[in-house]
């Protein structure tokens, strides 16, 4: 006898896009340093996945015998929450609280976990500049994600 258990919860699929480089800077020693962020997104359908990750199938081209195709739906606009770990600029993995903040993505928000330079990599206001740069990057690339 088979029994199907329905937990009664319909949760969206949550994706974590990691290592999105938003800035190239130098540390205090002059060595190059890539600053990156992670983006946690709730995806509602496969169309959103294709928009972000690309489609591996060749695109169909309509010809004179086929009906015109409808315009592709626009990406849903979501508010973005930027998350900076409270580490006193001592250095910590930006993704250490992903599981704790999954509820925000389930509620429909996009959550950006942003890496900023530690105090060993740059003196204040370098961290504020990094935060502003991350905001500019997200605004400029909002349509991509």
Tell what function each PLM region has:
Residues 1-75:
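N-terminal cap/lid segment of alpha/beta-hydrolase-fold proteins
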Residues 54, 75-88:
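Short beta-strand element of the alpha/beta-hydrolase
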Residues 71-76, 139-145:
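Gly/Ser-rich "nucleophile elbow"/oxyanion-hole loop immediately N-terminal to the catalytic nucleophile
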Residues 87, 110, 115-119:
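Short beta-to-alpha linker loops that shape the active-site pocket of alpha/beta-hydrolase fold enzymes
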Residues 91-95, 121:
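Short N-terminal helix/helix-N-cap motif within the alpha/beta-hydrolase-1
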Residues 95-112:
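Short amphipathic alpha-helix adjacent to the substrate-entry channel of hydrolases
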Residues 122-143:
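Alpha/beta-hydrolase active-site loop
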């Amino acid at each position: 006898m088979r029994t199907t258990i329905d937990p009664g919860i319909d949760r969206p699929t949550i994706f974590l896009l990691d290592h999105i480089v938003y800035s190239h800077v130098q540390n205090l020693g002059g060595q190059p340093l890539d600053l990156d962020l992670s983006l946690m997104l709730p995806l509602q359908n496969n169309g959103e996945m294709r928009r972000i990750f690309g489609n591996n199938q060749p695109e169909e081209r309509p010809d004179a015998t086929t009906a015109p195709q409808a315009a592709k739906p626009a990406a849903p606009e979501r508010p973005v929450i930027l998350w900076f770990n409270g580490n006193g600029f001592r250095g910590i993995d930006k993704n250490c609280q992903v599981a704790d903040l999954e509820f925000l993505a389930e509620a429909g928000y996009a959550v950006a976990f942003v890496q900023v330079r530690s105090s060993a990599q740059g003196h204040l206001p370098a961290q504020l500049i990094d935060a502003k740069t991350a905001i500019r990057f997200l605004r400029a690339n909002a349509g991509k994600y």
